[in-house]
Amino acid sequence: MEIFKLINQELQRQQDQIELIASENYVSEAVLRATGSVLTNKYAEGTPNKRYYGGCEYVDQIELIAIEKLKKLFGARHANVQPHSGSTANAAAYLALLQPHDKVLAMGLNDGGHLTHGSKVNFSGKIYDFYHYNVDPNTYLLDYDEILKKAIEVKPKLIVCGASNYSRAIDFAKFRQIADHVSAYLMADIAHIAGLIVAGYHQNPVEYCDIITSTTHKTLRGPRGGIILTNREDLIKKIDSAVFPGELGGPLMHVIAAKAIAFDEALQPKFKTYIKNVIDNSKAFCEAFINKGYQIIANGTDNHLFSINLFKKFNLTGDLVENWLYQANIVVNKNMIPYDSNKSMNPSGIRLGTAAMTSRGLVQSDFVQIADWIDQIIKAKGDLNVINKVKSEVKKLLVKYPIYQDRDY
């Protein structure tokens, strides 16, 4: 069938290309097995032991295992594993805490925030009244004093911290102080850094934030999905009711099973080693660009990602460089940078991440080599001879790091 042919072609693409998109990763064979299991046949509207359908005795056990493992990972009192994505987790969190047109303060999209943090084209910006804080225009770092001033001015009901493109550590304790000062709820969207948090390489928001949302892929290395956490007893029912029946009908039980497996994998000692390698690789990768004279947003990284300003020094846009690199089998994504004068489809930057290729086994020296390849292509302004030379070297490198060797669709 044509679909299976295309899946095999996608498998080959993943094998042959260097994946530097910060929101992508490679799941384990066990996670793949669960995602493609017979659990996809089962409708299980409701929550464990409170379903609206019969025949749920096994999926009840699966969901309860997922919940308990997730609570253990974060040290949280309560967890909901049903959201289909990070966006639906955020939507449910807002539904639990807010009324339409309530004020919310979140990170600006260009500064590193997410569409669901109040973009005017997103449901969040249409239903709620979002205001935004920005990074410092010189350092591109969060300025907590300025965020406090903005919070006092806006008087939001909810403050959202967390980002989709911020390379430095986030101080949840400081955000808690700001939220308390204006009597606001505090929500952390940790979609990108969840893996770092559970491995102990980033401050845990659970003790500081009223509600925490995340994806289960990215650095957590699970299936595509979302989660919600809280330590507040008075919010548990509101959160669960916001997910079902407020937002979702039937949960995806095959994905919840895959989440449970990924959570168990993240509880193992080798996951902490993996995350340390992700961060070490990211720092080495970033430093290689700094040594070549590139402008790195926030002048470095504390996590799995960083962004490069291509426009200031090279007068290049992210879409152009993304295309050049893709021709050489290097996959990145174009990205807006703080205070960007360009539009979203031809922004000034690219974003790079190390989580996926670290999963494949690449080490710091490999990332230094990749930085050199990217530098060659950028400085040659996409010359095809340079692109083809790099592409052949990329293929030689990746032969040493195969993925899903026994898979065939």
From Swiss-Prot:
Names of required cofactors: pyridoxal 5'-phosphate
Keywords recorded for this protein, A-Z: Amino-acid biosynthesis, Cytoplasm, One-carbon metabolism, Pyridoxal phosphate, Transferase
Catalytic activity reported: (6R)-5,10-methylene-5,6,7,8-tetrahydrofolate + glycine + H2O = (6S)-5,6,7,8-tetrahydrofolate + L-serine
Gene Ontology cellular-component terms listed: cytosol
Site (Plays an important role in substrate specificity): residue numbering on this chain: 217
BP GO annotations: glycine biosynthetic process from serine; tetrahydrofolate interconversion
Pathway the protein acts in: One-carbon metabolism; tetrahydrofolate interconversion; Amino-acid biosynthesis; glycine biosynthesis; glycine from L-serine: step 1/1
Main location: cytoplasm
Self-association and partners: Homodimer.
HAMAP family hit by this protein: SHMT
Family: Belongs to the SHMT family.
Protein name as catalogued: Serine hydroxymethyltransferase
